[in-house]
């Protein structure tokens, strides 16, 4: 039996696309991913997405790619800012075990 883990990942690009299979295989995972970016064709050479996912929000595309059921995870197609802590998404943070930052630029 795998240990339970409630995780939040901020950023759904290359690092997350490679890390997510290991997390899913290691834990009984409850996951929330925040990312407002859409997948672009130029992302495909360094991120584990499929051609038919171009144009989708990256957070949603990753949930589909790794077969997360609705009860296992949530994809939030918005950029994470501290303002999110004052929105309807704040409950995700109340009892999470770990927050993982996988952002790909300094402003993020």
Positions of predicted regions on the chain:
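Adenine nucleotide-associated cytosolic modules
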Residues: 1-108
């Amino acid at each position: 039996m795998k240990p339970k883990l409630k995780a939040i990942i901020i950023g759904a690009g290359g690092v997350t696309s490679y890390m997510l299979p290991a997390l899913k295989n290691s834990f009984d995972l409850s996951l929330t991913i925040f990312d407002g970016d859409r997948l672009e064709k130029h992302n495909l050479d360094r991120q584990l997405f499929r051609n038919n996912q171009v144009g989708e929000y990256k957070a949603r595309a990753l949930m589909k790619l790794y077969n997360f059921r609705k009860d296992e995870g949530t994809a939030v197609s918005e950029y994470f800012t501290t303002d999110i802590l004052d929105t309807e998404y704040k409950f995700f943070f109340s009892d999470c075990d770990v927050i993982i930052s996988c952002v790909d630029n300094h402003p993020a």
